[in-house]
Amino acid sequence: PETYAFLQELRRRVDEKFPGRVLLAEANQWPEDAARYFGDGAGCQVVYHFPLMPRMFMALEMEDRYPVAEILEQTPEAPEGCRWALFLRNHDELTLEMVTDEERDYMHRTFLTDPRARLNLGIRRRLAPLLGNERAKVELLNVLLMSLPGVPVIYYGDEIGMGDNHYL
C-alpha cells in the first residue's frame, strides 16, 4: 500500500512541476496486480504488460491466438488517461517468469538455440536472432504489437534487426 501511495504523491508532484510528463511502471506481475500501479488513474499513466510478451511469441510459433487472447481476457482495462505498455523484448531478456513451467519448457525448446542466451528463467536474445532472422516473423510480431490496445514499445536495435552479443 505504501508503494501505491508514494506513486500517487510522485505523480501529483510531477504533474505540478512538469506537466505532460508520463510515469511508466516496470512491474513484472500478473495484469490484475500490475494494474494497481495505475492507481485508478492517479498513479502511473503507463504500466508494462509483462505476461503478454512471451505469449505473443507462443502464439506466433503455435499459429494460435489462444495465448494472447487468454492473457488479454485476464487484463483489467486501464483507467481513463492510462495505457498498458506492450513490448516484444526488453533490455534484459525475453522474460519467462509469467508463464507456466510447461510453457517455459516450450519456449526454451523453441527459442533457446544457443545455451549462452539463457538468463535466469528467460532468454537473452535480440528480436531478429530470436526469430531465426526470419523477416516475415519479425514483421508479423510487430504488426501484432502495433494492433493491440496499448502503447507499443520498441527496444532499441530491434527496428534494424540488430544481432546478439552475449558478452555485453
Please provide the spans of the model-predicted regions.
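Active-site and adjacent substrate-binding regions of carbohydrate-active enzymes
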Residues: 1-168
